[in-house]
Amino acid sequence: VTAAELGASWRPGCPVDPAQLRRVDIDHIGFDRATHRGELIVHEDLVPEVITIFERLYRLRFPIEKIRTADHYPDADDEQSMEDNNTSAFNCRGIPGSDHWSQHAYGRAIDVNPRLNPCVYATGTFQPQNAANYLDRGRTDPGLLHSGDPAVRIFTDSGWRWGGYWTAPIDYQHFERP
């Protein structure tokens, strides 16, 4: 992809060059149980894995509300994307509260149904801000991710790490590929 195609999700100084990123068209089952097509931007090395993972999620009929690139939101605002329950990958941004790049800035992380699967910090704060109802991980709503779920295993069996296994923060939406 080009810098122009990435829009506000990329800027000079980002740790990955646009030429190292690829746009991947993804079929997914929506919350309406119909097939939808979305787009992810990922690192070129991960394209075959990402295609396979999302084909498996599709066959599992795991519901994903929407899949859009970060540039669909003003200034590629991550909070707006998460509040919209948008599944996304590349976004040149840091780790909140840190001076380190997020794996999203390398195209090596995917957040899945982020409103339903919030990131919970040790302080008790969480993102996105409209996810309070989903802090209760005993819920069984379609699209939620839990330890041992087939959807989680599809990622982890492919070598991805799930933020739901972390202790601080616990990032239920987040999968990253080292």
Per-region residue spans from a language model:
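Catalytic cores and adjacent binding grooves of peptidoglycan-active enzymes
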Residues: 94-101, 106-178
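Long, contiguous hydrophobic alpha-helical segments, chiefly transmembrane helices and signal peptides
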Residues: 26, 53, 90, 110-112
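A generic structural signal for short, non-catalytic loop/turn and secondary-structure boundary residues
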Residues: 16-19, 83, 103-105, 168
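Active-site-adjacent substructure of cysteine-protease-like catalytic cores
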Residues: 77-105
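N-terminal low-complexity, Pro/Thr/Ser-rich intrinsically disordered segments
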Residues: 1-9, 14-16
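Active-site acidic/histidine clusters and adjacent loop/turn architecture
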Residues: 16-82
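A generic secondary-structure signal marking the coil-to-beta-strand transition
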Residues: 22-24, 86, 108
